[in-house]
Amino acid sequence: MVAIRKEQSLSGVSSEIKKRAKRNTLSSLPQETQPLRKVRIIVNDPYATDDSSSDEEELKVPKPRKMKRIVREINFPSMEVSEQPSESSSQDSTKTDGKIAVSASPAVPRKKPVGVRQRKWGKWAAEIRDPIKKTRTWLGTFDTLEEAAKAYDAKKLEFDAIVAGNVSTTKRDVSSSETSQCSRSSPVVPVEQDDTSASALTCVNNPDDVSTVAPTAPTPNVPAGGNKETLFDFDFTNLQIPDFGFLAEEQQDLDFDCFLADDQFDDFGLLDDIQGFEDNGPSALPDFDFADVEDLQLADSSFGFLDQLAPINISCPLKSFAAS
């Protein structure tokens, strides 16, 4: 009897659990069939017991303690990532597919032009090196790469024009100075001319440093030993030569001793007045009166110490050495 009751109780519990599970599944089923996520919850209740009978208590049969298990299933709709609607219409589907295929290919990095660099905040800065001042010149900040590249190219063309102008002017100055120096220092070379040939070629300095050849009017050939009148338009035979024969006469020579005459240097006194130079003998000194010294009273003051000299009481070392 006890075993039958146990089987009935277990069958009743299992049937009740199945009914509840069916109810939950039926109630949780959506009206429309869609993929769902099922969550199953299993709980074991150790304090839940079956109904006990007096017969079991009387028999006192030991039995293991039973635990009640509760199972619950909950269905959730699956969470799908909603796709953002494309801006293009269905007609542009083929175009978008082509764009996707192109973008999928590896992009080739574009080379930045010279003098342009990008800032951290996205702007494009341009600068160029000044070839004249040897410094960097700031061109500014631009929104796009193309604007910065255009500014760099324009400034570069400007600098190239300035440098080309300076080079041409320096070359022109150097060439003009060389040509002028050559025209000054180069000797004149005679050129043999014919009646049919042109005259000597002359170099004309142009501002563009281009030597041009200008022909001059031909001149007739002059034969050797020709007439002098044709060249100089003057007859030297008619030139009168002065007569210098008066220089050969007496006392007509150029007398330069007059410049050293004695009367010209009387104030300076020549050596003729000094005695003793012609005979190489002594000359008499002029008399000098020393009476003026007494008037100056030098005998009593300046030279008086000569009469007032103290006696020299110094023992002679030679006598003492001889005595010893």
From Swiss-Prot:
Biased segments, Polar residues type: 24-34
DNA-binding region per Swiss-Prot/TrEMBL record: 112-170
GO cellular component: nucleus
Main location: nucleus
Any one GO biological process: ethylene-activated signaling pathway
Bias type Low complexity, positions: 77-93
Start and end residues of each stretch annotated as Disordered: 1-120
InterPro entries for this protein: AP2/ERF_dom, AP2/ERF_dom_sf, AP2/ERF_ERF_subfamily, DNA-bd_dom_sf
Key words of the record: Activator, DNA-binding, Ethylene signaling pathway, Nucleus, Transcription, Transcription regulation
GO molecular function per UniProt: DNA-binding transcription factor activity; transcription cis-regulatory region binding
Cellular localization per UniProt: Nucleus
Annotated Basic residues bias: 109-120
Role played: Probably acts as a transcriptional activator. Binds to the GCC-box pathogenesis-related promoter element. May be involved in the regulation of gene expression by stress factors and by components of stress signal transduction pathways.
Family membership: Belongs to the AP2/ERF transcription factor family. ERF subfamily.
Name this protein carries in UniProt: Ethylene-responsive transcription factor ERF118
